[in-house]
């Protein structure tokens, strides 16, 4: 149990590092797009509610 718990903590720390990683210089022009990409699924969720409101929640 303690082994799996420490592995979980170790992996979560590495995952946190990945969120703060910078793109290589060759891809620096895509940085604004990459900043917006995590929000795109939220737009689809909101689109579902707008669509249902448009069809009167059938």
UniProtKB/Swiss-Prot annotation:
GO cellular component, as recorded: chloroplast thylakoid membrane; photosystem II reaction center
Pro-sequence residue ranges: 1-21
GO biological process: photosynthesis
Transmembrane segments: 29-49
Record's keyword annotation contains Chloroplast: yes
Record membrane topology: Single-pass membrane protein
Subcellular location, record wording: Plastid, Chloroplast thylakoid membrane
SUPFAM superfamilies documented for this protein: Photosystem II reaction center protein K, PsbK (SSF161037)
Keywords (A to Z) from UniProt: Chloroplast, Membrane, Photosynthesis, Photosystem II, Plastid, Reaction center, Thylakoid, Transmembrane, Transmembrane helix
Coiled coil: none
InterPro entries found in the cross-reference section: PSII_PsbK, PSII_PsbK_sf
Family label: Belongs to the PsbK family.
HAMAP family xref list: PSII_PsbK (MF_00441)
The protein's role, per its UniProt record: One of the components of the core complex of photosystem II (PSII). PSII is a light-driven water:plastoquinone oxidoreductase that uses light energy to abstract electrons from H(2)O, generating O(2) and a proton gradient subsequently used for ATP formation. It consists of a core antenna complex that captures photons, and an electron transfer chain that converts photonic excitation into a charge separation.
NCBIfam families linked: PRK02553.1
Subunit composition and interactions: PSII is composed of 1 copy each of membrane proteins PsbA, PsbB, PsbC, PsbD, PsbE, PsbF, PsbH, PsbI, PsbJ, PsbK, PsbL, PsbM, PsbT, PsbX, PsbY, PsbZ, Psb30/Ycf12, at least 3 peripheral proteins of the oxygen-evolving complex and a large number of cofactors. It forms dimeric complexes.
Protein name: Photosystem II reaction center protein K
């Amino acid at each position: 149990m303690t082994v799996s718990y420490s592995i979980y903590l170790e992996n979560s720390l590495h995952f946190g590092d990945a969120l703060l990683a910078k793109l290589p210089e060759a891809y620096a022009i895509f940085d604004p797009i990459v900043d917006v990409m995590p929000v795109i699924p939220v737009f689809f969720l909101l689109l579902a509610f707008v669509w249902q409101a448009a069809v009167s929640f059938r």
